[in-house]
């Protein structure tokens, strides 16, 4: 049986988390704590390593701790029975760097699908209440993780739509 799981994550200056390391069991893990201590930010940082971007924040400067000029997330995963180290770093005002086993990706889309993940939050009521656009985006994100052809065609399609809308 092929299994994917996270062994460990080290988070530095990610939102309200200044410097923490978390070690996980390969079965079930529970995050427990008072409101505002960073439980959701831990989940978002894991999502960030799996997808290459935050689930909750579109802009990189929103995820860097306000007291610092950079953020770093480092995760040790087991993917398809192989050890994988994923690192994401951002300097304030700079570009995001995403690395797999110490090698930087040229395109973020090359990373998508290595560590499939789905995150659903209380903010996702729009999947049910709003129109089909939000549902389509959600389904596209899931399919794209498992089908590179679909991902590449979706990227091309979105570029065509953007170009058309500029006319």
Residue ranges of model-derived segments:
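Pre-Walker A-like glycine/lysine-rich segment at the N-terminus of P-loop NTPase domains
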Residues: 1-48
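ABC transporter nucleotide-binding domains
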Residues: 27, 45-46, 114-116, 138
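Short, histidine-centered active-site or binding-site loop motifs used for metal coordination
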Residues: 28, 121, 142-143
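Regular, well-ordered alpha-helical segments
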Residues: 48-51, 166
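Nucleotide-state sensing region of NTPase/ATPase domains
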Residues: 51-126, 132-134, 146, 150
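An accessory alpha-helical subdomain
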Residues: 126-167
């Amino acid at each position: 049986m092929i299994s994917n799981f996270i062994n460990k994550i080290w988070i530095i200056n990610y939102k309200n988390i200044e410097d923490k390391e978390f070690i996980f069991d390969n079965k079930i893990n529970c995050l427990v704590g008072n409101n505002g201590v960073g439980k959701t930010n831990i989940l978002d940082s894991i999502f960030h390593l799996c997808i290459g971007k935050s689930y909750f924040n579109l802009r990189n400067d929103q995820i860097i701790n306000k007291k610092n000029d950079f953020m770093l997330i480092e995760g040790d995963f087991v993917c398809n029975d192989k050890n994988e180290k994923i690192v994401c770093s951002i300097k304030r005002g700079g570009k995001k760097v995403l690395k797999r086993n110490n090698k930087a990706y040229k395109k973020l889309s090359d990373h998508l699908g290595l560590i499939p993940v789905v995150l659903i939050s209380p903010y996702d009521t729009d999947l049910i209440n709003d129109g089909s656009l939000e549902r389509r985006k959600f389904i596209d994100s899931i399919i794209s993780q498992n089908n590179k052809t679909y991902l590449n065609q979706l990227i091309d399609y979105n570029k065509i739509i953007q170009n058309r809308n500029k006319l």
